[in-house]
Regions:
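One-carbon transfer enzymes
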Residues: 1-221
Length: 221
């Protein structure tokens, strides 16, 4: 099974390390040389070079040139883990199995931006690590793998991120054989249960001391 990976954040790097470790046929990687958008940005090319994996720096992943580069690799499936823009239909149609994306929330609930930060700020006690088949919507495609996790009172943004990554890497190792054998299942999302989280801004982080102590704590996590 030939795989292309698209990504440019810390989780993308950890996923790339996992794919290499379990000897996946990784035929290409698309990443960014720099980013002012993602605080957890990582350039995947150095690791690709060490392991002789073809790597392309891209800005607009949906450009005709980049779509053709991916097409020429003839992937069976594309993994998009950690990309800040929507993947459009030209790339969605390239691989027979489509594009698998990732969202650390219990889809169909809590689609959209900054899911881990929103979960902490709102004081959620649980969420989920979700891989899904991407479509033209935002986090709306069929679910491939979903694992629940607890959010403890002690969790902050850093250790919650680490916790979710470890869960996601186990999921990757588990669902890849199912993709290879064609034994995976697709679970449609229930639109009646869905909601969307917006992009956070500076005002969302302001502390109002009329808030409860718990609410203030949640903002500082």
């Amino acid at each position: 099974m030939k795989v292309v990976l698209i990504g440019s954040v810390e989780f993308s790097l950890r996923a790339l390390e996992k794919l290499i470790a379990i000897d996946v046929d990784l035929v290409g990687v698309c990443t960014k040389k720099s980013s002012t958008f993602n605080s957890d940005f990582f350039d995947l090319k150095p690791l690709c070079d060490i392991n002789e994996v073809p790597c392309l720096y891209v800005d607009n992943i949906n450009s005709t040139k980049n779509v053709e580069w991916i097409k020429n690799l003839n992937p069976d499936v594309i993994f998009c883990f950690g990309w800040s823009s929507l993947i459009k239909k030209d790339i969605l149609a390239v691989a027979p199995m489509g594009v698998v994306g990732y969202h650390p929330a219990k889809l169909p609930k809590n689609r959209g931006r900054h899911p881990l930060i929103w979960a902490l700020a709102l004081g959620l006690k649980e969420s989920a690590s979700t891989f899904f088949f991407m479509d033209e919507g935002a986090d709306t495609g069929d679910i491939l793998s979903q694992v629940d996790f607890e959010i403890s009172y002690q969790d902050d943004a850093r250790n919650l991120y680490d916790k979710v990554v470890e869960i996601a890497l186990i999921q990757i190792e588990e669902f890849i054989p199912a993709l290879e054998k064609g034994t995976y299942t697709r679970i449609k999302q229930n639109e009646k249960e869905s909601n969307d989280w917006r992009k956070r801004n500076e005002l969302d982080g302001e502390i109002d001391f009329r808030m409860s102590s718990r609410s203030i704590y949640n903002l500082t996590r």
